[in-house]
UniProtKB/Swiss-Prot annotation:
Transmembrane feature ranges: none
Any Pfam family hit: CsrA
Protein name: Translational regulator CsrA
Classification via Gene3D superfamilies: Translational regulator CsrA
NCBIfam families: csrA (TIGR00202), PRK01712.1 (NF002469)
Source organism (scientific name): Shewanella amazonensis (strain ATCC BAA-1098 / SB2B)
Length: 64
C-alpha cells in the first residue's frame, strides 16, 4: 500500500485521468473529491461491497 500525506487543497493523481483532492479535515474525518471519467466507477468501500454481494446473490451480514 502506498501511503501519502496531503494537506487541504492538495491533489494526487491516479493514472492520467483520476484525481483525488483533499477538500477538508474535521476531527477524524477527511472530505475528499474524486474526478474520474464516467466509465470509471467510484464508490465508498461499503457501497461497493453491497453492490458486489447483490450481483452474486449472497447477502452480507444478514441485513436482507
Amino acid at each position: 500500500m502506498l501511503i501519502l500525506t496531503r494537506r487541504v487543497g492538495e491533489t494526487l493523481m491516479i493514472g492520467d485521468e483520476v484525481t483525488v483532492t483533499v477538500l477538508g479535515v474535521k476531527g477524524n474525518q477527511v472530505r475528499i473529491g474524486v474526478n474520474a471519467p464516467k466509465e470509471v466507477s467510484v464508490h465508498r468501500e461499503e457501497i461497493y461491497q453491497r453492490i458486489q454481494s447483490e450481483k452474486t446473490g449472497s447477502p452480507e451480514g444478514g441485513n436482507y
